[in-house]
């Protein structure tokens, strides 16, 4: 039996022992060393050769990732680790740290129970560290901390033992501050990381060594020894005494929960069904014999096997050859293969039980976020995956050769399945399709993926996505149906800030409001009692309130009114961009007694026109997407860097100093960020580190609004000037 076969046999055996499984993610800011760390963990587990680890970028098996040297997708791998004479199955997901790929982090966090947060000792905790930690804690994922690149503190910054310890304590206190702010209430204390119990380790992923307090006690290696090893260029010897994989995987086994422990508190948080039901109990006890429950976190397309869905089995076992039911798409399909990952390759098994990360071939039509169960035991679906950022940059994509048109549409649908954070609009009439993503790099990689699937394309210059809103209360507006027999009286005003923020952060759910149980939630975030009890629908961070009393037949047209409200918000009156942050009230309605005269063809135009007219008479405003930009640069380059930000309509939010490095935090409109990478590099002569993260939408300066509205409308083939309210209700 070869070593590989032995390893696979162990994996197949351990996956039936949920106490011995750890599902973990590795997450960090870009370039803090996640993939190098993952490679060396694999080498320690005997999966790749130690010489190649670190340079091999084993988990970056996409050509784009190897070429750019960054992780774009979240990659999966399973390995076996021996800790205190017990064997454990560790399922590892390496996630991207670049802000444009934050969607992969969100999806990976749904599949895991624990996270190793990697922080660079030189740079400390950076904005993206905070974002990935927030995503982990939001999904109830427990963190441990690894401080990486310690050799650089010693060899480049020449720090003494006391200074080293001080640097570590700063990072660890900062990490705990974030954990205490963002962890679930009952876990704030329990999940704080601690040097003494070994839930914090430090080392060098590149040089393959790591140490924590328990390991120091066991081996007798102390801070001074570490400095000597680094100074004498003997890190290879150090790696033999305190190997990275021993320390890190030991920390994972000791401090991160098994599925058996974590599913008890995670399932109620991500599944809306009845916990007392057989499915609920099966998930909470991680039973391989309970009703099947799988949450799909990722879908990729394989040249030979077709669509491959990766996900987490929460309950029951998924078996090869059985029929399964996809809850979201209401469809059945037959499972052709199931199995687990072993590096980039997939290992087929007959079944994969609860508590494991699984791949499934044959779940046709599944997308990330789908719930798979058995057709006999249908269950409620898992909660949707909330991505922290939303697509803000769009490119138009066309096929270079007309013969590729049908293939391009197929490929775009595939790409949208593989990466749910992008938005694809397919227009079969014009052949111009729009792809929206999180930023320039995200769209470049998507264009590359389309070409990789065999379609040559042309892309337009990137276009920024705007939003529409209003700045004041409108007068009451009357919307008439084409037959003049139905009338609706509507006002609009800006939504309360507190409520808008709660919707943006996902504290309140969007969708039709059932019954009055949500009234308290709306009141908590600023609606008065009367309004809170009468909310009909929440959509695009806007609410639709029925403020009428005793109108005959209103219930019969309620669904149509909601449909009209939602479709009007999808393309606002100002520039056909999505509208958000609005509070609409229906004050009165006059309806024809005969149902024939109040069908969709009458009600939909009436309500849409009333909504458009009310918005156009309430100070219509464009909102533009903003990015936070963080820059680390030597003091001497602070001036040129701040000028670069200010030349792009940016505002400086905060400036700080750490040693001889300056830190600048700023906010810049996305529209001004194109080409920033090259410009900031030349401003600081290459001596700066920078990163961005989404910062929501803000009002466009009034003096720019007319020009930008005109440009958007012309691009969309509309008349250059938006229509006034009288056009809609005249």
From Swiss-Prot:
CDD domains: aeEF2_snRNP_like_IV (cd01681), EF2 (cd01885), EF2_II (cd16268), EF2_snRNP_III (cd16261), Elongation_Factor_C (cd01514). One of its GO terms (molecular function) is GTPase activity. It comes from the Archaea. Gene3D superfamilies: 3.30.230.10, 3.30.70.240, Elongation Factor G (Translational Gtpase), domain 3 (3.30.70.870), P-loop containing nucleotide triphosphate hydrolases (3.40.50.300), Translation factors (2.40.30.10). The modification Diphthamide is found at residue 597. Residues 19-260 form the tr-type G domain. SUPFAM superfamilies: EF-G C-terminal domain-like (SSF54980), P-loop containing nucleoside triphosphate hydrolases (SSF52540), Ribosomal protein S5 domain 2-like (SSF54211), Translation proteins (SSF50447). The keyword Mitochondrion does not apply. GTP binds at residues 28-35, 94-98, 148-151. Keywords: Cytoplasm, Elongation factor, GTP-binding, Nucleotide-binding, Protein biosynthesis. This is Elongation factor 2. The gene is fusA.
